[in-house]
């Protein structure tokens, strides 16, 4: 199965992932049900990191690179989160440092942490492993690291930390994807966790 990317490479001299942020993923029909294939937003191929959260994560990093000329990103989330391979692969694409805050001494037993390690991420182990505590530690560490930004837990933009125009821009990048949803669709079933993708869809 193919993704929407014409080639798969970390090398920005070969391909810039951000050029495809607004490209539409296809709608495909199986057994009379139509699926919006967000899993085909896959810059490293169909079996690699993919999806709408990957797109939003890429947008965040691309904005930081363009507006702040950052040198690295600090991220804190639970060991099982796909946030880890997302941010580490994007940092590798942009040649940025990636520091992941974890609450597990045995983080290398977890698949997403192994993937992040392979992408070049470094790790800081803390005593508390709850998501909110890890994000707090990430912000503390970023203050000590020049040129670093924090990827918020769940790849979101908290209204307490971000101005309204940034929150709107964050959701706008996902909102474009409704453009090719067929007009005859009457009912949409949307899986949700953090609800970021849901908000983007509704905004679109």
Regions found by a protein language model. Name each.
Residues 2-71:
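Positively charged, low-complexity intrinsically disordered leader regions
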Residues 28-30, 64-69, 92-93, 142-146, ...:
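Flexible, charged surface loops at secondary-structure boundaries
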Residues 62, 89, 93, 203-204:
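Short, well-ordered alpha-helices that flank and scaffold nucleotide-derived cofactor binding pockets
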Residues 68-90, 94-102, 186-194:
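A short, small-residue-rich loop immediately preceding and capping a beta-strand
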Residues 87, 138, 201:
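Aromatic/hydrophobic pocket-lining residues that form π-stacking "cages" and hydrophobic walls in ligand
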Residues 105-183:
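Small/polar-residue-rich loop-to-helix segments that shape phosphate-bearing ligand pockets
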Residues 192-204:
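Conserved mixed alpha/beta catalytic, RNA-binding, or beta-rich assembly cores of soluble enzyme
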């Amino acid at each position: 199965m193919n993704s929407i990317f014409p080639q798969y490479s970390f090398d920005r001299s070969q391909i810039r992932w951000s050029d495809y942020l607004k490209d539409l993923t296809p709608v495909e029909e199986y057994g009379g049900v139509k699926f919006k294939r967000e899993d085909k937003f896959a810059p490293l191929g169909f079996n690699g990191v993919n999806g709408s959260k990957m797109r939003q994560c890429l947008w965040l990093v691309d904005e930081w690179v363009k507006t702040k000329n950052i040198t690295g990103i600090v991220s804190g989330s639970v060991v099982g989160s796909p946030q880890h391979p997302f941010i580490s692969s994007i940092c590798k694409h942009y040649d940025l440092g990636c520091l992941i805050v974890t609450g597990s001494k045995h983080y290398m037993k977890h698949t997403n942490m192994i993937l992040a390690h392979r992408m070049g991420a470094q790790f800081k182990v803390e005593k508390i492993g709850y998501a909110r505590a890890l994000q707090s530690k990430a912000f503390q560490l970023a203050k000590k690291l020049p040129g670093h930004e924090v990827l918020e837990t769940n790849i979101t933009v908290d209204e307490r930390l971000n101005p309204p125009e940034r929150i709107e821009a964050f959701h706008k990048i996902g909102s474009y994807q409704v453009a090719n949803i067929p007009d005859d669709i009457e009912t949409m079933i949307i899986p949700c966790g953090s609800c970021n993708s849901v908000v983007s869809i509704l905004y679109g």
